[in-house]
Design a protein with these regions (language model features):
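Single-stranded nucleic acid-binding surfaces, predominantly the OB-fold ssDNA-binding core
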Residues: 1-84
Length: 84
C-alpha cells in the first residue's frame, strides 16, 4: 500500500484540532476527514469518525494493523510539518 496524495487544510483556532486531512491510497481510494490533533504527547492522526446515538465516537475507516497506522501517521505528519 502506498499513500499517493496527502491534502492538508490547517485550522486556526483555540481547539486541539490542528488540521483536517484527505489521503489517497494507491491512486485509487480516497479517505477524507482525518484529523491532526494536539495531544498530551504531541500531534497524532485521528481517523474519520461519527458520533453514535449513545454519545461515543466510532471510526468510519481505520487501519487494521499497527504498521499501516504508523505509515499513515508518518506520511500525514511529515506533510503537515512541511506545509506553512
Amino acid at each position: 500500500m502506498k499513500i499517493t496524495d496527502v491534502r492538508i487544510r490547517k485550522v486556526d483556532g483555540q481547539t486541539r484540532l490542528r488540521a483536517v486531512v484527505s489521503i489517497t491510497i494507491d491512486d485509487a481510494f480516497a479517505v477524507h476527514e482525518l484529523r491532526i490533533i494536539e495531544g498530551k504527547e504531541g500531534l497524532f492522526v485521528a481517523m474519520p469518525s461519527r458520533e453514535s446515538n449513545d454519545g461515543t465516537f466510532r471510526d468510519l475507516a481505520h487501519p487494521i494493523n499497527a504498521e499501516t497506522r504508523a505509515l499513515i501517521e508518518k506520511v500525514v505528519l511529515d506533510k503537515y510539518n512541511s506545509v506553512e
